[in-house]
Amino acid sequence: MLGTKQVFSTEWGGRPLSVEVGQLAKQANGSALVRYGDTVVLATVTASKAPKDLDFFPLTVNYEEKLYSVGKIPGGFLRREGRPGENAILTSRLIDRPIRPLFPDGFRHDIQVMIYVMSNDPDCSAEMAGMLGTSIALSISDVPFDGPIAGVTVGRVDGEFVINPTTAQLEKTDLELQVAGTSTAINMVEAGANEVPEDVMLESILFGHEEIKRLIAFQQEIVEAVGKPKFEYTVSKYDEALTAELEAARPEIVEAVQVEEKHARDEAINEVIAKYVAMYEARLADEPSKLGEVSGILNKFVKDEVRRLITVEKVRPDGRRPDVIRPLASEVGLLPRAHGVGLFTRGQTQVMSVATLGVIGDAQIIDGIGLEENKRFMHHYNFPPFSVGEARPVRAPGRREIGHGALGERALLPIIPKEADFPYTIRLVSEVLESNGSSSQASICGSTLALMDAGVPIKAPVAGIAMGLIMEGEHYTVLTDIQGLEDHLGDMDFKVAGTKDGITALQMDIKIAGITREILEEALEQARVGRLHILDHMLETLETPRTQLSKYAPKIVTMTINPDKIRDVIGPGGKMINSIIDQTGVKIDIEQDGTVFIASTDQEGIDLAMSMIGDIVREVVVGEVYDATVRRIEKFGAFVELFKGKDALVHVSEFSLERVANVEDVVKLGDSIQVKVTEIDDKGRVNASRKALILEGLSPEEREAYEAKRKAARESRPPRDSRPPRRDGDRRPPRSTN
């Protein structure tokens, strides 16, 4: 049974926006249908009836791109949507990040957010519509949520900021930023940029926040009209008496958290916890739940002391000051057969990035609900369990790995040379070998070194750094180059990557409601200083890209042919191009504009393939001289091959200055002769002459004598109308147009 639909409308980035509630998915705790232009997104929120016995908040966000939204039927045998693509995974993370901090502390009900893209208009962002729909569904539901939030995309076209740029505007923008937050603060940023200065990045974030405030006011109208009362929930609290008793352990905790080395520090903390758990085992044997609280209380002390030491005493767990970067080390060229390798180490975080160069045909084909595209630059990030000293099952890359890989890709894309300048597909793989925080940023540094080691002519080196934040009341401390414990116990993970001239990528996640302009400004400046320090170190390892590619990398040459000739090169069913590949051992890719890429590690194979393709697409030019081969002899003349696939007729009268009665008196099959093309008729048939070349070789006196002889011969002939009819029919029968 259909419910009563209520519609709320406004505009967003110059396009119509409407929200429908009350009609669809009524059994969910909350649902909203968002129409933005021709984009239609359904967002639903469901909560479990009872809390889960977990030590974390069980929130799941699934963003699903339905292929019917763009009128496509899925491929594959089943013709169903399969596992989510990379864009869907990244969008799920994008929506999760701004809503997660706004659920109550200690809230443990299972929350599932599902977003269906049901119609997709490329000019009206389904991702941002999905974020808006999620916030509305949560805000009008009975689920406790300290929203609403909103998110927008900000671009910069011709120096002007634009809200939710269209696909055409995105082609021109030097900045693409997604920012989300509440009416009072920003709590999520994701950006890719073309070396944008820090002040421009900050202004773009604040520009987006103004639009966020307007969208939140719009949502509040919806909540006032249809919002449900929030359900009651319980949050377990530690026993106050037990907490007071365990205060005796605090001095030992303070000492343990200041052990500088990661594993030694973890061991020291665990020893303190184990000691006090053992002390209380006998006493609390009849109260197992309270015994479980002992480790929880002590872990809370660990968090409290780490944060206090940083904010009050300005001392970090490893002894650094807030703005100090861990020791750096880097190397290149470690793997002899790989095309490029960069090993980057920062403290106890180490990443080996490997660059592989491939042909254009190796590019990844992206075919989702967006426009189909070929992706010639890829960055993949792997995080094996041994990197943190653990033994656990190895599975396919998860959301975190995909997200970190995409962040590195976004950071490096602005420095990758254009296809016309460097016609290679580039794949980077970052293997995390050790991790104690900031591994995604180490992968960016390692990847830059790998690109330079591979000889890729990058625009400029890129480095990345992760900033942190500890906030206690009105006091806060911004941390440079956070390690794992600071990331885990801190309030912000703020990743900034860029060149010496500006930012290429930025990502911010926070665990508090939001941060202010002042904190953003300080974090960006501190990150800039740190980034420049890291870049200086990297350039000491390898100052410029290598001038030569690895001998194991394919050589790629390009040639341009007439697009009308592409079908001739490919041949029926690919017969011709496959024949060239089989004979030469090369890889061949042909673009629609007639650009041909020929790749191989063997230069001779490349040269032969170029010659074969050149013969296929070569055009006959009137007036040019060719070294031809006699292929067929007829009474009226001989057919000669000018080059492979192109023949011409040399008429019997065009062989010599003298009259030729029999063609075979002057040429034989297989003879090589020089001829000059004299005509291409309207049917494409080519006429050539040997006599024309002989005439060109005569001296003026010889030519004059020849012309006089011809004139005399013509005058001695009887008139044409007095001649009898020819007995052999036409002078020249039809011939092949080859």
UniProtKB/Swiss-Prot annotation:
UniProt domain S1 motif: residue ranges: 623-691
Ranges where the record places region Disordered: 704-738
Protein name, as recorded: Polyribonucleotide nucleotidyltransferase
Cofactor names: Mg(2+)
EC number: 2.7.7.8
Disulfide bonds: none
Transmembrane helix listed as a keyword: no
Record keyword Lipoprotein present: no
Gene that encodes it: pnp
KH domain segment(s): 554-613
Main function: Involved in mRNA degradation. Catalyzes the phosphorolysis of single-stranded polyribonucleotides processively in the 3'- to 5'-direction.
GO biological process: mRNA catabolic process; RNA processing
NCBIfam families with a match to the protein in the record: polynuc_phos, PRK11824.1
Stored InterPro entries: ExoRNase_PH_dom1, ExoRNase_PH_dom2, ExoRNase_PH_dom2_sf, KH_dom, KH_dom_type_1, KH_dom_type_1_sf, NA-bd_OB-fold, PNPase
UniProt-listed PROSITE patterns: KH_TYPE_1, S1
UniProt xrefs under PANTHER family: POLYRIBONUCLEOTIDE NUCLEOTIDYLTRANSFERASE (PTHR11252), POLYRIBONUCLEOTIDE NUCLEOTIDYLTRANSFERASE 1, MITOCHONDRIAL (PTHR11252:SF0)
One Pfam family here: S1
